[in-house]
């Protein structure tokens, strides 16, 4: 019976917090640029959310893949979160998803296929909500459960949002509150479910992306495993700018600050802060910085520009010193 399964006990990490640390990953892929192709609008250069390839005038294909180990004990909800997270990369580029395929790793001897079925059902329900079909997939046996999707989308090249197109002097908008990594860590340790976190992680970034494109935003990324600080740093670095954050304006999920005070801090969040700390100019406390670096799963969009209905959390600036982010 799937309701008695504690999925998080089958994995060392969970959600986007199980990513390879950013600094290590950058070392691994350094110099692996690939063949130059004028039709590749976004490729390997700046670690953007997805690839974008022009296939004809006025049309580009977006390609991305995302999968991870469970951050929730409920298999259906894990499937929903994983699918929303994978599709987020398409939305973060300003695109519209058109199809997705499942990516599965499964410890058959430890977990029944009835559990996997619930995971896949969750993913399919989110795909249906997004207006697309799940058209196939690939599976392997694995020591830990893994699930996600490879997603394909489309975008008009002149509407493409990318992480290297930010300019100074613009508002910074965040479309979801942060803190789900901390709450997921508490869930793994105690079994306590934060419905606010589940609701946030299973909310598609579709409407936020549409609003951003309509507002003329051209620089964006989504906030996932490297935390708000990490993804903002990557965007600033790729664009050659800096940013100032207003900590008091950053929205947080209900219960996240309390869970942080109780010590439920994911290792990935601490690694994120260690990675970005040399690029910070800050007077914030360590606890506040950990929250800003918290590894998000299926987080919101970080948009350079003001978008009606979503909070502004800072602004971009010229880069004049060593720091990329002032907070």
Give residue spans per PLM region.
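Acidic-glycine-rich active-site phosphate/pyrophosphate-binding loop
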Residues: 51-62, 202-208, 273-283
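Glycine-rich anion-binding loops of enzyme active sites
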Residues: 55-72, 96-193, 315
